[in-house]
Amino acid sequence: MGYMAETIYTTRDINRAIRAQMKKGAATRIEGLTGQDNIAVGLEGDVKITIIGEAGDFFGALNCGTTLLLKGNSGRFLGDTMSSGKIVVEGKASDGAGANLHGGEIIIKGNAGGRIGVGMKGGMIIIDGDVGDELGVNLFGGDILITGNAGKNVGRSMTGGNIFVNGKIKSLGENAKALKPGKSDKLKLTNFLTKQNLMGEFKFKKVISKREIPLDTIKSAFGMSIKKGLANEEPEDI
């Protein structure tokens, strides 16, 4: 395993060290991260990188196939526009984790901020903790799983994908509804939880799109006055 125990202070130096180890095909361990932005951005290749310390914004953005383990907290936009690979955070994450995610997995073993999975199109986000407001806003696809509580406007303007919340939901956003998970959902959840060694008694609610096209989009495009009762199903009490 490539190992760098000395403290490195600049984003440029850290990323150079990571790429140098990746060229050798070696697993890499970096220590001394102190909040630098844009660490491990745009990496390609089936290599595992362990980073110890506090990451700034855009950690692991544009990831394509690399496994990143962060032993510490992350700033905003963790894994932004990631296409494949895996990011595990053994700590908390700030706002916007998994924004515009296309594929791969993001696992946060702690609480996270707001707007998790905004604009997400595929892949998986698992958060073993609570999240802030606007979870899954503008969600197009993929799965988001929260073992704790969620804030306001969950699933606002979502048109696809699934959001699973085990705890309390402060409020649903426009175009979102909450249902009880079906048999296939329960099997999927069991597989997700078992894979991450998350054990316990879970009672998830499933949040999905109420309409195929968000109400705001229809109003804006056609100048129509549409009543909220357009959908046949109403969200269950949460």
Regions found by a protein language model. Give the residues of each.
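Intrinsically disordered, low-complexity terminal regions
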Residues: 1-39, 109, 128, 134, ...
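A mid-sequence interfacial segment
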Residues: 86, 96-97, 102-105
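Short loop/beta submotifs within extracellular cysteine-rich repeat domains
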Residues: 57-58, 76-77, 95-96, 114-116, ...
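The right-handed parallel beta-helix/beta-solenoid scaffold, focusing on the short coil/turn
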Residues: 26-28, 37-39, 45-47, 57-59, ...
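Feature marks extracellular polysaccharide-active and adherence modules
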Residues: 31-33, 42, 52-54, 61-62, ...
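Functionally constrained cores in energy, signaling, and assembly domains
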Residues: 10-11, 28, 44, 55, ...
